[in-house]
Amino acid sequence: MTRYASMVLANPVPGREDVFNDWYTHVHIPDVLTIDGIVAATRYRLVAQRGGDPAIAGFSYLTIYEIETDDLRGVFRTLVTRMGTALMPMSDAIAPERAFYDWEVLGPRVLADPAGVAAAAGAQGMPDTAISEESA
């Protein structure tokens, strides 16, 4: 099965941020996760922009959906068919301008090795407490 990351950039309607966030977290994501192949979702709020693509500069919220399927178009067909129905009601608190980017996963998720980080920190004269679990 092929793995994908689908990025959705969105904004709330001005003055409706609380309604937008409540709907997105408690209604929309659970609805999207009922679609076969969409296995996880994580939401993010922009805290800083350090250059990059000006086309996405106006968005404050990002959701990354993890998808596992051999039929990506079929997953999106189901998603589009359900949007705005009782199976996936949309909110008037989401601004109509959105951006969608889909990526194929090329390798496994790589995690830092705490022992390796500690060894490197010690070699650089950094205190081990700077990378302890308590401070992470």
Outline where the language-model segments fall.
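Macromolecular interaction modules
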Residues: 1-136
